[in-house]
Swiss-Prot record:
Bridged cysteine pairs (disulfide): none
Function recorded in the entry: One of the primary rRNA binding proteins, it binds specifically to the 5'-end of 16S ribosomal RNA.
RNA-binding as UniProt keyword: yes
Gene giving rise to this polypeptide: rpsQ
Keyword set, alphabetical order: Ribonucleoprotein, Ribosomal protein, RNA-binding, rRNA-binding
Record's protein name: Small ribosomal subunit protein uS17
Pfam families: Ribosomal_S17
InterPro entries: NA-bd_OB-fold, Ribosomal_uS17, Ribosomal_uS17_bact/chlr
Family statement drawn from the similarity comment of this UniProt entry: Belongs to the universal ribosomal protein uS17 family.
A Gene Ontology term for the protein's cellular component: cytosolic small ribosomal subunit
Single annotated GO MF: rRNA binding
Quaternary organization: Part of the 30S ribosomal subunit.
Disordered: region residues: 78-103
Amino acid sequence: MAVKERVGTVVSDKMEKTVVVAVESRFPHPIYQKTVSRTTRYKAHDEDNSCRVGDRVRITETRPMSRHKRWAIAEVLSHSPKADKSAGSTAPAPEAAAKEVSE
């Protein structure tokens, strides 16, 4: 039996070692033949907590890890530019912010 793989976008990373990945599938409508998009959300295991919202990832089917989690992150295809900015954000010091307000 072949290993199932999906490519999707991380839409939530608020859980420990778990992310929610949205996978979009496109198919023609059986009657009208218009291309229809359907989004399925999978909970996937992220051992290192390395994924952030907006990342493109490849997930593979694994053994059941919990009630809803049966997928694992195989690789991160691309990181979200928004996640890169937040990781290296340089927020102004509180003194500098107070100085700007007083001026």
